[in-house]
Amino acid sequence: MIYLDHNATTPVDPRVVEVMLPLFTERFANPASKHAPGQEATRIVERARREVASLAGARPREIVFTSGATEAANLAIGGVLATAEPGRRRILVGATEHPAVLGAADAAVSAGSAVSADGTTAAERIAVHPDGTVDVDDLRRRLGPDVALVAVMAANNETGAVNDPRPLVEAARSAGRCCCADVTQALGRVPVEFERTGVDLAVSSAHKLYGPKGVGALIASKDAWSRLAPRVHGGGQERGLRAGTLNTAGIAGFGAAARIAAESMADDGTRQRALVALLTELLVKRLGPGAVELNGPVRARLPNTVNLRFVGAGADEVQACAPRVAISAGSACSGGGDEPSHVLRAMGRTATEARESLRFSLGRATTTEEIRTAADLVARAVLRVRSLSQSTPIQDEVRDDNRASSNSLNRGSAASKES
């Protein structure tokens, strides 16, 4: 299997596993305990806090550990709304945001803790340009005294589009509004400067940068901290903002992953950008320049990511015809629905064009040989999908072919045993 879906999740780095393992069976104490093992656990957590803060360009005291970016987004959005003035209840979110952010914002509007200018039950979407970057002019038009929060991602999970945070933060700050950035895909892949950009809140997750699943962080500036109300109540951990026994092993893994990412990010980015260019070149050469279209910016993009439309070939069918390559037709966090990508639709793609698009997201261990093989397999799959009769369900035919191949192999194995 050639795994090219690292924006969905990454394997845990063996060096991270090495840090985590002793914390399950040997150094397992609760960081809230006052005895020596508990204090050792506290030191482990605080070391990880410093490592995550360093990678994010933040201060350690600005890091709040959570169960992941989804919880962090809910804490950011719900926490700000809980303390917002009665006349300041609108939320503005980028149209291409991750489902975690969109879901949290829409839920706040549905529950009545937030409102939308048009009276709908969804948070207002800030338009994006055809390349997927946020339209700052549309943000400025929507800003008003009744806006509580602006949420815009640093880098998109489907197209890799990277937003310049400075004009977005300047627009929000000029109106005196709180600004939240989803840095989940950016952290560890491109430089993130939380304090320097002036963002109030940021959310992230360990499993996107070779750390464990089930741990993430909300980054909150000193000013934003005072605007947040906790969403989880209990023992008062994380300075009262996120109750619950700390996941020491997961947090330590997050810290180790952040430290490793800081050391390797520049070299990884250079190598992955070259491999993405090679992949695109090979596919265009094989299929023709008019048969492959780029979704997203040419340059302002994550170095490991490219989203391509294969004209006339459905993404699901291409995936079925290339089972040896793990690629994605959209966000893995959107519940696996059949709707076309909301990201590509917001960029102006038709439903058909969106359904013909696939995301390739490379990883730290991706090789040139894997890219050449993947390009060949995907190109073959695209050509096959186009050649198959429209009257034949492609996925059914592929399953039949795979079953026949499996039966043939089984017969060969049985014959070998008989002989």
UniProtKB/Swiss-Prot annotation:
InterPro entries, per the entry: Aminotrans_V_dom, Aminotrans_V_PyrdxlP_BS, Cysteine_dSase, PyrdxlP-dep_Trfase, PyrdxlP-dep_Trfase_major, PyrdxlP-dep_Trfase_small
Biased composition range(s): Polar residues: 404-413
Binding site for pyridoxal 5'-phosphate: A69, T70, N157, Q185, S205, A206, H207, T245
UniProt-annotated catalytic positions: C333 (cysteine persulfide intermediate)
Disordered, as annotated region: 392-419
Residues the entry annotates as binding [2Fe-2S] cluster: C333
Positions bearing N6-(pyridoxal phosphate)lysine: K208
This enzyme's EC code(s): 2.8.1.7
GO BP term (any one): nitrogen fixation
Reaction(s) catalysed by this chain's protein: (sulfur carrier)-H + L-cysteine = (sulfur carrier)-SH + L-alanine
Keywords associated with the record: Iron, Iron-sulfur, Metal-binding, Nitrogen fixation, Pyridoxal phosphate, Transferase
Molecular-function annotations in GO: cysteine desulfurase activity; iron-sulfur cluster binding; metal ion binding
Cofactor(s) this protein requires: pyridoxal 5'-phosphate
Assembly and oligomerization: Homodimer.
Reported function: Catalyzes the removal of elemental sulfur atoms from cysteine to produce alanine. Seems to participate in the biosynthesis of the nitrogenase metalloclusters by providing the inorganic sulfur required for the Fe-S core formation.
Entry similarity comment: Belongs to the class-V pyridoxal-phosphate-dependent aminotransferase family. NifS/IscS subfamily.
Protein known as: Cysteine desulfurase
Species per Swiss-Prot/TrEMBL record: Frankia sp. (strain EuIK1)
Phylogenetic placement of the source organism: Bacteria, Bacillati, Actinomycetota, Actinomycetes, Frankiales
Gene (name only): nifS
